[in-house]
Amino acid sequence: MDRAALRAAAMGEKKEGGGGGAAADGGAGAAVSRALQQCGQLQKLIDISIGSLRGLRTKCSVSNDLTQQEIRTLEAKLVKYICKQQQSKLSVTPSDRTAELNSYPRFSDWLYIFNVRPEVVQEIPQELTLDALLEMDEAKAKEMLRRWGASTEECSRLQQALTCLRKVTGLGGEHKMDSGWSSTDARDSSLGPPMDMLSSLGRAGASTQGPRSISVSALPASDSPVPGLSEGLSDSCIPLHTSGRLTPRALHSFITPPTTPQLRRHAKLKPPRTPPPPSRKVFQLLPSFPTLTRSKSHESQLGNRIDDVTPMKFELPHGSPQLVRRDIGLSVTHRFSTKSWLSQVCNVCQKSMIFGVKCKHCRLKCHNKCTKEAPACRITFLPLARLRRTESVPSDINNPVDRAAEPHFGTLPKALTKKEHPPAMNLDSSSNPSSTTSSTPSSPAPFLTSSNPSSATTPPNPSPGQRDSRFSFPDISACSQAAPLSSTADSTRLDDQPKTDVLGVHEAEAEEPEAGKSEAEDDEEDEVDDLPSSRRPWRGPISRKASQTSVYLQEWDIPFEQVELGEPIGQGRWGRVHRGRWHGEVAIRLLEMDGHNQDHLKLFKKEVMNYRQTRHENVVLFMGACMNPPHLAIITSFCKGRTLHSFVRDPKTSLDINKTRQIAQEIIKGMGYLHAKGIVHKDLKSKNVFYDNGKVVITDFGLFGISGVVREERRENQLKLSHDWLCYLAPEIVREMIPGRDEDQLPFSKAADVYAFGTVWYELQARDWPFKHQPAEALIWQIGSGEGVRRVLASVSLGKEVGEILSACWAFDLQERPSFSLLMDMLERLPKLNRRLSHPGHFWKSADINSSKVMPRFERFGLGTLESGNPKM
């Protein structure tokens, strides 16, 4: 397409290089004319390339490997052209430059290359030039970009590009050794060219002595005849064996001498192989090697060639592990799987979603329709190892899991011997003594053999294709740009596995930090798809065992045939509750949902995982679950006693300040434990709290999340609301309720649980709900606006300390509501009722309670009179 323009640019460059002295004699006019001619020719190439790039970004699917390769090729060319324009302009003194020459390079072209949004470009003043932005300091430039509406990612991307351009152009077009810049925050290909592509520009044309930084970007090997535009970029690229995947085999080529000597590079024997020079950043402890001369023959074949070079044998310093680069990214195809969430935002369109897809490689979450617009997938090397304590689970007495030993693949380079293994860190004292030993964070081999793979509390042995859930690795913010995958290169690499230990990165899944989600939850969500009985023990040439999460699920699975179902004892929005027997008396919660719907089944298994990790005296004991469709059920211990709802409304029961305090403290202990585990109850109310002989047990936590998929017969234009449910809902939830929206889409949070506890606290004092005999429409307005709560607080007389707790829990702003730990401290400040049973007033008070059915009076404590029929409430 632009071959003729490239030849013209090459001829102009040769004239510039050959007639330097004549140009100097000709004066400034000749230099200006030559610079204008060069910039004009380059601008034509830029316009042609930008037109092609615009078509690729708008008309083609960016998730396609071929499209990604073409986009990177054009972006690489455009960056080279713009930097060449800047260097041509800088070759002329500022006083001799004309207005036409100063207009190069165009700022709009630079912004388009890095994929700045059009609305941001429109806000940028027309008079602003690239030179003016280069002269600004980092803070000022970032502030201006933000003022024009640029996002944080766009600001960071442009700042890195400008920093590199400053280093190149600040030398007046003369390239020096220290002008190179290696990116530490690489970006996605859809957001602009890789930053490492720019780093090679600062090293173009430099002397060939000493080691250089290595760019890991997959720059295309072009057959361009312009030596000045291609040499500087090509000689610093890492051969990624066509696929762009950086493997240990590719790492060996960093330190491998050329198979073809420099004197024979023009001989017609066979295409030469051109390994790059060693990198200071990848191997900081390696001895310096002389820089290898770049071969110019067969340049067009280097990008599509797999070089089988023989690694050079050398000795590393004793005990020095290889340092893996943190900015290495691998370009792969998305591996989407269907997912369901309680509340999630699409990473592409930024809209809320319940059902969608998630990439198992880069953990991208989006709608199914947004996959065409999703950015390219990346797998990152995980640089640091962090230990995580293994949760203890009971042995599976119903479904024993066969955990056979599994072969392990080495991940250490051959140069590292057994004596040079890094020292292992000690595990937590609470961990299983047979747990897998971890290596130091800088070690490239964090996977070692477990001493007891058959233990019930020990997760499966890790392999290169599987993550051990006890190890968590902090991710970097983004992944480096790399060349697209090639199926041929993948198969070739796997065929060569006996020769070179290759890490199967296509099976490894990199983790990304997600706001508000622990790594354990992320693992559960990613591996909750299938039970281990339906998973294959071998997947591809590299083995991969069932995940630890799926093993946990099978250990808690109870065959429905073993459960004896009794009479129904309750009905919830998600199904019926039956009394039953399974090694004793249990409560069986049958879920009325389509078990053959994979999305619903995954959501159910996720709730099982939430139940599995709970162990507290004030939380119902989880015993297992029936997970074989169509029989889906959660089995818990049977709660004796009465619900708190019926207990406080029974006029025969006596509730003094000590008893209400004790009940509230028990509820706070259980809720505080759930919140510490990262579990939001979502349906805390007096009907879900059982009270028996002074003991409080909280039930049905988390089940509210699946109520939206259970009650599918609802009408789209109607809201079915119960009075007892509205009284426990926080204002921010009531304001989000619209017809057709499922309950699991509402913004439930820990603060919403605190609000619900406020209503329970009110019931303990007043023995009724705060709003009575009002239609649902009136309750929605009173709760959503906060007016009804203010009226209740102003009209009721419950005492200072009780009112403070109530007003704190019912705060309109969720940020002002206290945590359950603070609520416990507030309860401790309540006055205590210390009166002996032999006090004369005790018998009179008891008779008064039984006769008039009113609560005792505590005027001496300032608590006022509480009656069950108070008309003010």
Curated annotation (Swiss-Prot):
It is a peripheral membrane protein. The gene is Ksr1. It holds the Pfam family PK_Tyr_Ser-Thr. Changing L78A: Impairs interaction with BRAF and association with membrane ruffles. Zn(2+) 1 binds at H334, C359, C362, C377. The lineage of its organism: Eukaryota, Metazoa, Chordata, Craniata, Vertebrata. SMART domains: C1, S_TKc. Residues 1-170 are annotated as: Mediates association with membranes. Zn(2+) 2 binds at C346, C349, H367, C370. This is Kinase suppressor of Ras 1. It comes from Mus musculus. GO terms for molecular function: 14-3-3 protein binding; ATP binding; Hsp90 protein binding; MAP-kinase scaffold activity; mitogen-activated protein kinase kinase binding; protein kinase activity; protein kinase binding; protein serine kinase activity.
